Amino acid sequence: MLRIWGRINSTNVKKALWTARELNLDYEQIDVGGQFGGLKDPAYLARNPNGLIPLLEDGGTVLWESNTITRYLAAAYGKETLWIEDAAKRAQAEKWMDWASSSFYTNFSNVMKHLIRLPEAERNPALLEQSLQGLAQSMQIANEGLKEAPWFSGENFGIGDIPTGCYAYAWFEFPIERPSLPHLEDWYGRLKQRPAYQAAVMTPLT
């Protein structure tokens, strides 16, 4: 059985959990990180020297980096579903995976901290506003990316949709004003209909 290490409210862990659920894989989820600690334990660091989450164990295969885990699970278990055999089409999907990780992470982390996690007295309104503007710009790029195809993976849902899908849930749940992004909103509406997305991603923001 697969083992996925990481707290369920982590956006990066959600990628792994969502992928596993889309593929109907049996897995054990182990809480580490955040309030659970454990990331500096020698046994954990022996598996992931970065001391970060998620971590995947599949028999003798041990992987870290959330996008790598998503790719691995899709390639190993999703040949007829999430994985894209055509190299050029797969590269288009993977482009969006890597773009999401580099474009969203810093601004998203700041918003989570200064809108959700910190006590109000400790929040930095200027940094929050700057980060919200950055997220809005990234979401506009994502919106434009959906003008020519219904999914970031092309004509069908696939690996390219998973990273942005995890960030999009929080974006649409934040108590903020959002610009009109019709292509992104349509795509998000279809994501919300997927049972695996509901179970793995649509959890309370904490």
Give the ranges of each region predicted by the language model.
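Short coil/turn segments at secondary-structure boundaries
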Residues: 109, 201-204
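Active-site-flanking alpha-helical
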Residues: 74, 167-168, 201
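Conserved beta-strand edge residues that scaffold enzyme active sites
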Residues: 34-35, 160, 205
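Carbohydrate-binding/catalytic loop surfaces
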Residues: 117, 205-206
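GST-like domain detector, emphasizing the conserved glutathione-binding G-site
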Residues: 1-129, 143
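Charged phosphate-binding loop/patch that engages nucleotide di/tri-phosphates or the phosphate backbone
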Residues: 193, 197-200
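GST-like fold's C-terminal all-alpha helical module
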Residues: 100-193
